[in-house]
Amino acid sequence: MSIILDKVNYIYGEGSGFVKHALKDVSLAVDKNEFIGLIGHTGSGKSTLTQIFNGLLRATSGDVYFNGDNIYDKDYDMKKLRSKVGLVFQYPEHQLFETTVFKDVCFGPKNLGLDKRECELRAFEALELVGMDKELFYNSPFELSGGQKRRAAIAGVIAMKPEVLILDEPTAGLDPQGRDEILDMVKAMHEQTQMTVILVSHSMEDVAKYVGRILVMNDGRLMYDDVPREVFAHYRELEKIGLAAPQVTYITVSYTHLRAHETSLHL
């Protein structure tokens, strides 16, 4: 499985008086089983990029390939793509609507045309995977806590068995404990299923200890694409675009400078 973007551009409001060039010549590849952090401040293009990945937005120019097929080919099945590349929007609990958590999670598989038994089996598996307490399965989703609602919404996408799961700011609005619980859950889920996960965030601190690769977006361009250690080495450049490296980076840099100073004193 792979997603490949080749020189992708996206322009909002093309032909109007309010044009915004949201993506500028973005090229990258996402491989099977990766856990990727997609980082950038508001307006950097990261949310637009996620919607390009699963076909919700069509690139103004450039090409997107999924498993070797160009998704912009005339006969390409976009519905199938969106079931294979699952996108959990920011504040996904706003999309909960059924009378019970279980029914809500069944909604996606049902829309795929699966029979009742398969829908229910997938819902059970997905809810267990996100760590939802069984006694809450048949409660109203509106009675859940913020973190529980977030788990239910994520389960609704997982139940469609995507090959790629994109989470847009999954910890937004949660307290520190809720944030850690959601990120720990996502990490455990990735390890258990080997599903490709793309975690979208504006916080380096949130993703530093979870992902194996970081994409940094700035002003519509892919600024960095590397393992966390190499990306964080550019902490001064990151600061200039409003992003702070994890605290441990600054501690390491300070320690290195201190040792260098001590060494120079003994020379």
Language-model segments: what does each one mean?
Residues 62-73, 81:
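Conserved ABC transporter NBD signature motif
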Residues 256-263:
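Conserved small/polar residues in nucleotide/adenosyl-binding loops
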Residues 161:
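Conserved catalytic motifs of ABC-family nucleotide-binding domains
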Residues 117-135:
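Conserved ABC ATPase "signature" region
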Residues 54:
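Helix-to-loop junction immediately C-terminal to a conserved catalytic motif
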Residues 140-144, 148:
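Conserved ABC ATPase signature
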Residues 165-168:
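Catalytic Walker B motif of ABC-type/P-loop ATPase nucleotide-binding domains
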